[in-house]
């Protein structure tokens, strides 16, 4: 099949539409503070998009690159389309923010500027300024002897226009840098938040004594945050990375956010020094630095304005009183997070660190929380003399510094730490424990779609798989040998790994379904679909009658509902949990269910070490089947992709199905039922039965 550029949706525009779906949660019947969270998430996402994707397009344009995507849009065309899209959507963001804050006021929760406070609260703000703000803020003069300062990425400041009271004709410009150690809002009372810049503005003349304030404007800068590291030339990769992190702070300016109706001379002053293209200047009639809205959303006095808190459940065959290794030795176990608890994953490593029969623990780490119990368990194991091998991916974007910290801590404890593979990121999520049983060695494995991160495990949907099967032991051992040693053979037998096998295996399974024509079925759930070869193979399958359902949270470059894709349906699910699992079903393959750390993107399939895991266990396959069925039935959180690249909400029928809420209810029902049943084998059977029935 010959493809053409018009058969693909532009990657960057597809991502923008994903983020629009995040913002669209503000239009739904959600608790107010949940809506505020979605605004924070939307703005955080946009920050990263500008730091990496827009910055990259600017570099391509500067280098004279004409085409950089499957749809053959040039970097300049993409930049123009992005700016147009975001300037239009800015008005929608402002609308939702004003609407939500207005509704919050009806609930007696306020964001108020200094000038709108009563005298008592103003006095409290004044006291807070002198005790907490004044000692740490940085007043900056800009003139012939004071050059324009370095502004960190995403730094928040107040630009000022002032004049000398003794010489009113001498207008000067400067700024007040607001350090990140200060909270975004001052909680002046239990229900009133004052933006920090509002207090600083009020006291600007005390910050610049002897000067009169003419105007001020809050602004925020975004820099290019991508890092290019010459790994092949690095003798000490950790040192090179630390240098790269320092250079990142000095990346080129790519965006300026500033309050609307700012003094024209202030805007000109900033533009002159930052040299930001005028279309990358965004003026807001609402507050800036909205990722910090989490501070308000976390107010303990207004939990009634949040969704009810769900507690993940641990289901059989896992049991508090049973060794996790005994459970895994009896059968393969699959859990779906965060509906089922992440605790067994932690217990897997914790128990291994304490078990005297365990001689080796191996693990990959990509994104780890700052206070990680899992990494602490690895440190304890290494300190006790166990052989601990940890692949810490130092190139995990925006987690580099945290990963550096843990890599050093593990190394100091005696663990063998691998920093990565030259030219690749290691994105696979896998751990292996080896125990002595008499004169034999027994292997236990955990493979996952998500990170070893207890914090994200509460808000990401992911799939974890525990097994002690020999074929998985063989392949995980080979995988860790590839990571720690030299190997030209990067192929496994049961597992598939990228960059050599996963794409090849996926294309092979698509071809099998294509050969079955209208009896073929493919269901694939992932974060993003970009790879043009896989998209072309799906088009060919569709034209042969294969029924294809794709559940893609984010980027999708495939165009559904065309002559060549009339049998392909694409949906995206956006809810309170971030859909992060990658689950694939190919009806006529054997096995036919897979989980993976990899999306169907060139970066995952060609430039990362990833794993795709076949699922053989019938109970686990039944769970995955139910999981996919629920998501394909969702008419509350789901959006459907149209052939013009736009997404439409799935029309609700009389029976509404929220796949995330339904799974919460299913697992809670199972848990409640099982609490009454003390027979372990019967309880496990009941858990499986309930998953199938529901």
Curated annotation (Swiss-Prot):
Residues engaged in binding Mg(2+): 367, 397
Annotated S-S bridges: none
Protein's recorded name: Polyphosphate kinase
Enzyme class: transferase
GO biological process: polyphosphate biosynthetic process
Keyword vocabulary terms for this entry: ATP-binding, Kinase, Magnesium, Metal-binding, Nucleotide-binding, Phosphoprotein, Transferase
Reaction(s) catalysed (UniProt annotation): [phosphate](n) + ATP = [phosphate](n+1) + ADP
Gene responsible for this protein: ppk
UniProt EC number: 2.7.4.1
Origin species: Campylobacter jejuni subsp. doylei (strain ATCC BAA-1458 / RM4099 / 269.97)
GO cellular component, one term: polyphosphate kinase complex
């Amino acid at each position: 099949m010959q493809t053409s550029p018009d058969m693909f949706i532009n990657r960057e525009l597809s991502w923008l539409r994903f983020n629009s779906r995040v913002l669209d949660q503000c239009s739904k019947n959600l608790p107010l503070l949940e809506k505020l969270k979605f605004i924070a998430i939307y703005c955080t996402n946009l920050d990263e998009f500008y730091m990496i994707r827009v910055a990259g397009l600017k570099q391509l344009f500067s280098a004279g690159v004409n085409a950089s995507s499957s749809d053959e849009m040039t970097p300049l065309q993409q930049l123009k389309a992005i700016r147009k899209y975001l300037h239009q959507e800015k008005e929608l963001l402002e609308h939702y923010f004003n609407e939500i804050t207005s509704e919050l006021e009806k609930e007696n929760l306020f964001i108020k500027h200094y000038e709108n406070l009563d005298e008592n609260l103003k006095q409290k703000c004044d006291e807070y300024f002198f005790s907490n703000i004044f000692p740490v803020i940085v007043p900056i003069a800009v003139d012939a002897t004071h050059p324009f300062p370095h502004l960190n990425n995403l730094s928040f400041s107040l630009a000022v226009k002032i004049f000398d009271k003794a010489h009113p004709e001498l207008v000067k410009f400067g700024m007040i840098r607001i350090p990140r150690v200060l909270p975004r809002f001052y909680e002046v009372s239990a229900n009133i938040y004052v933006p920090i810049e509002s207090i600083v503005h009020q006291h600007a003349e005390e910050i610049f004594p002897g000067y009169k304030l003419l105007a001020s404007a809050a602004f925020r800068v975004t820099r290019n945050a991508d890092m290019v590291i010459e790994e092949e030339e690095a003798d000490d990769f950790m040192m090179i990375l630390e240098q790269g992190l320092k250079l990142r702070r000095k990346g080129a300016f790519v965006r300026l956010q500033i309050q609307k109706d700012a003094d024209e001379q202030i805007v000109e002053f900033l533009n002159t020094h930052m040299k930001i293209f005028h279309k990358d200047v965004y003026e807001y009639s609402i507050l800036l630095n909205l990722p910090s809205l989490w501070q308000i959303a976390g107010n303990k006095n207004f939990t009634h304005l949040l969704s009810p808190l769900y507690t993940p459940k641990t289901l059989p065959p896992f049991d508090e009183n049973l060794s996790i290794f005994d459970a895994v030795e009896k059968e393969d176990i699959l859990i779906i997070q965060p509906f089922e608890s992440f605790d067994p994953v932690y217990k897997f490593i914790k128990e291994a660190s304490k078990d005297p029969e365990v001689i080796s623990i191996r693990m990959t780490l990509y994104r780890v929380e700052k206070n990680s119990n899992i990494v602490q368990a690895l440190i304890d194991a290494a300190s006790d003399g166990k052989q601990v091998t940890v692949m810490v991916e130092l190139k995990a974007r925006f987690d580099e510094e945290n990963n550096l910290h843990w890599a050093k801590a593990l190394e100091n404890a005696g663990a063998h730490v691998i920093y990565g593979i030259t030219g690749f990121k290691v994105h696979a999520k896998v751990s292996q424990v080896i125990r002595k049983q008499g004169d034999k060695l027994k292997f236990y494995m955990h493979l996952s779609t998500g990170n070893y991160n207890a914090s994200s495990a509460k808000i990401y949907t992911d799939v974890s798989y525990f097994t002690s099967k020999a074929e998985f032991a063989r392949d995980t051992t080979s995988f860790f040998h590839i990571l720690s040693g030299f190997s030209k053979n990067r192929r496994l037998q049961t597992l598939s790994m990228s960059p050599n096998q996963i794409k090849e295996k996926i294309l092979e399974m698509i071809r099998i379904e294509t050969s079955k024509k209208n009896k073929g079925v493919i269901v694939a759930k992932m974060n993003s679909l970009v790879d043009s070869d896989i998209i072309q193979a799906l088009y060919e399958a569709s034209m042969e009658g294969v029924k294809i359902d794709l559940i893609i949270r984010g980027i999708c470059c495939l165009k559904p509902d065309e002559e060549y894709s009339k049998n392909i349906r694409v949906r995206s699910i956006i809810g309170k949990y971030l859909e992060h699992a990658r689950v694939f079903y190919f009806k006529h393959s054997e096995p036919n269910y897979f989980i993976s750390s990899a999306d169907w993107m060139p970066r995952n399939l060609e430039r990362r070490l990833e794993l795709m895991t076949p699922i053989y266990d019938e109970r686990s396959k039944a769970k995955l089947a139910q999981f996919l069925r629920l998501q394909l039935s969702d008419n509350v959180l789901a959006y459907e992709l149209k052939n013009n690249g736009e997404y439409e909400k799935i029309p609700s029928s009389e029976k509404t199905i929220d796949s995330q809420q339904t799974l919460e209810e299913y697992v809670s029902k199972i848990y409640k039922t099982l609490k009454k049943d003390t027979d372990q084998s019967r309880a496990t059977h009941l858990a499986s039965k309930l998953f199938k029935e529901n």
